[in-house]
C-alpha cells in the first residue's frame, strides 16, 4: 500500500503527496468578489496538501447565491487569484479552481433584482443563507436553450481565466443542488426539450460544460464534483 506522503499522478497533475483539500466556502472575498490577501494566507497555510480544490468560484454575476464568494469573470478577480495561486505554489502544492453556478439557490436581492434561473420553475425550499432580514427563496425562471449555451460559454471563459490566474486545473461543481445538479435531477428538471426527460438529456448540459473545460485545459486537468 502506498504511503499517504508518497507522490501521486492524478490525471495530468503530479502531486507531492496523496492529501487533497476539499473545497470550503469561506466568504472572504470583497463585495466585488475579488480574492483578498487573507485568502492567500488561508490557502498558503493549507498548502502542505498535495492538491487544494479551491472554494467554489462563481462564473458570472448571475451565478452567485451568497455574499462575498469569489468569482472568475473579471480582470480584477483574476489578479486577486494570482496572489492565492502563487502562495500555494510557493509551498510546493497545486490548486485547482472549482467553477460554480448556483442556479435557483439565490435571490433577486443578490442578483440586482433579477430572478434566479434553473432548469424549471421549481422553487428551492427554505430561506436564503445569511441574508438579513430572512427571505424565502423565490421560484426561478427556466433557462432558454440559448441561455444554456451562453452559460456553457461562461464556464469556458472562467476556465480560461483560471489558467491566467495560475491555477493548475479546474473542477466543475455539479452537485449539492446547484445549477448543473438541478438539470440532472428529475425533481427539478421538468423540461420537455433536449435538456429534459431522459437521463441522457438531463446530463447534456453537464457534459457540454465538461467539453468546454476540456477545450481549455485538456482532459487530464478537468474534474467533476
Where are these regions (language model features)?
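Conserved, mostly hydrophobic/aromatic
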Residues: 21, 46, 88, 97, ...
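N-terminal amphipathic alpha-helix/helix-capping segment at the start of soluble metabolic enzymes
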Residues: 1-23, 47, 88
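Catalytic domains of carbohydrate-active enzymes, especially glycoside hydrolases
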Residues: 39-60, 165-169
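Non-globular sequence segments
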Residues: 86, 100-161, 165
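Structural preference for beta-strand elements that scaffold enzyme active sites
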Residues: 18-20, 51-53, 94-96, 169-171, ...
Amino acid at each position: 500500500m502506498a504511503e499517504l506522503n508518497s507522490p501521486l499522478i492524478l490525471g495530468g497533475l503530479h502531486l507531492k503527496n496523496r492529501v487533497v483539500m476539499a473545497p470550503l466556502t469561506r466568504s472572504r472575498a470583497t463585495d466585488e468578489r475579488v480574492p483578498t490577501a487573507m485568502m492567500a494566507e488561508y490557502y498558503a497555510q493549507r498548502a502542505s496538501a498535495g492538491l487544494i480544490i479551491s472554494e467554489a468560484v462563481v462564473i458570472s454575476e448571475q451565478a452567485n447565491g451568497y455574499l462575498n464568494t469569489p468569482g472568475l469573470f473579471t480582470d480584477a478577480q483574476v489578479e486577486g487569484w494570482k496572489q492565492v495561486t502563487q502562495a500555494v505554489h510557493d509551498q510546493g502544492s497545486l490548486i485547482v479552481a472549482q467553477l460554480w453556478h448556483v442556479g435557483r439557490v439565490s435571490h433577486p436581492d443578490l442578483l440586482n433584482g433579477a430572478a434566479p434561473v434553473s432548469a424549471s420553475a421549481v422553487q428551492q425550499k427554505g430561506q436564503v443563507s445569511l441574508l438579513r432580514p430572512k427571505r424565502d427563496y423565490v421560484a426561478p425562471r427556466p433557462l432558454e436553450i440559448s441561455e444554456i449555451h451562453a452559460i456553457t460559454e461562461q464556464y469556458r471563459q472562467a476556465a480560461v481565466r483560471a489558467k491566467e490566474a495560475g491555477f493548475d486545473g479546474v473542477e466543475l461543481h455539479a452537485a449539492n443542488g446547484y445549477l448543473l445538479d438541478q438539470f440532472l435531477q428529475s425533481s427539478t428538471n421538468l423540461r420537455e426539450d433536449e435538456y429534459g426527460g431522459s437521463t441522457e438529456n438531463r446530463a447534456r448540459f453537464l457534459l457540454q460544460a465538461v467539453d468546454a473545460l476540456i477545450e481549455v485545459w485538456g482532459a487530464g486537468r478537468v474534474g467533476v464534483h
